[in-house]
A protein has these predicted regions:
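Active-site glycine/GP-rich loop and adjacent strand/helix microenvironment
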Residues: 42-326
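Conserved AMP-binding loop of ANL adenylate-forming enzymes
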Residues: 4-46
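Motif I (Walker A/P-loop) of helicase-class P-loop NTPases
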Residues: 1
């Protein structure tokens, strides 16, 4: 409870706030219960609505008037779409802040990525707070109102950023997040390698906090792709695809080619399947990351099923087949 209460405080929440929990606390999602207990610890009001069902979310907002929500940010776009379809003036709703979980909102320069920019354009009155967490951390690293990286709670976790040789990286360089938990009794971790690649900043934040700040996750160490001499991480590819009009959904597949090198296939769900659109996609990739993967068009429904297999709680956008194709 304490860790999430501190996270909410960093995001500017006070006991005067009412938070709408737009995530489940069931289906083995432990963080959902932590959010609920954290809000109670802070003495906020908290409404357990659960995930999905835009109609129920908007009915709750109308009836109770929450000031903030805890939400997977891409769901906010669905809330907006439902509101527009049903004549709800969402920009004048009671919601003023969203504590966003599970998906990145920022680039490494603290600007909005594609998802963050899209939500902000649709709903400028809603302030977005990016978070970074994992089960092993047992805490959240959360932005303050200056949105210059997530603040590490120094009384709960020790964070190091290390290179391939286990040496600390220089300020502003990418490194693997290595954590040591503090005060955890059940499963304490000493220098646990998360596999996440971030950039750390130690300069004092404008909010007055002097603890380390972390960028959004650049990628997973195990998901690094070396394609035609260029180092890529899946989130960079997601950001490009989600900014191309006409791309409804997608799955990125990586496999080992006949020469032992990484190869990328973009399986794209779209109503368009013409050569001009394929060229547009490849040209966009060349302009952003200097290389163009293979493009394969698939039915939107096929990709949707692949993204959410049975019993899956998280959407799949990246499939690593390299071990199977070596």
């Amino acid at each position: 409870a304490y860790n999430e209460a501190e996270s909410f405080t960093t995001a500017g929440c006070t006991p005067e706030d009412v938070l709408q929990l737009m995530t489940t606390i069931d289906r083995r999602f432990m963080a959902g219960l932590a959010y609920f207990l954290g809000a109670r610890k802070l003495r906020c009001g908290v409404i357990r609505v659960g995930n999905g069902i835009p109609e129920l979310q908007w009915d709750t907002i109308r009836r109770i008037g929450p000031t903030g929500c805890i939400v997977v940010p891409s769901f906010l776009t669905k809330l907006v779409a439902y509101a527009e379809e049903h004549g709800i003036d969402y920009r004048r709703s009671s919601l003023r802040r969203a504590i966003c979980i599970g998906e990145a909102l920022r680039d490494t320069a603290f600007g909005n990525n594609t998802l963050g920019a899209k939500i902000t354009e649709l709903w400028p009155e809603l302030e977005l707070f990016s978070t970074y967490a994992s089960t092993e951390m047992q805490t959240s690293i959360t932005e303050c109102g200056h949105h210059c990286g997530g603040h590490v709670p120094a009384d709960l976790i020790l964070v190091e950023l290390l290179d391939e040789q286990n040496n600390p990286v220089a300020e502003g360089e990418e490194g693997e997040v290595v954590i040591t938990t503090l005060g955890v009794r059940g499963m304490p971790l000493l220098r646990f390698r998360t596999g996440d690649i971030c950039i750390g900043y130690t300069e004092r934040c404008a909010c007055g906090r002097g603890t380390m700040r972390l960028s959004s996750v650049i990628g997973r160490k195990g998901q690094m792709i070396k394609f035609k001499g260029t180092t890529l991480y899946p989130p960079a590819l997601y950001d490009i695809l989600e900014n191309i009009p006409g791309v409804s959904n997608y799955i990125i597949e990586v496999f080992t080619g006949s020469l032992g090198t990484d190869q990328i296939v973009l399986r794209i769900g779209s109503a368009r399947r013409d050569e001009a659109f394929e060229k547009e996609i490849k040209d966009t990739f060349r302009s952003k990351v200097r290389v163009a993967p293979e493009v394969v068009f698939e039915p939107v429904e096929y990709i949707a099923k692949k993204q959410m297999p049975q019993m899956s709680r998280k959407q799949i956008k990246f499939v690593d087949l390299r071990e199977q194709t070596k």
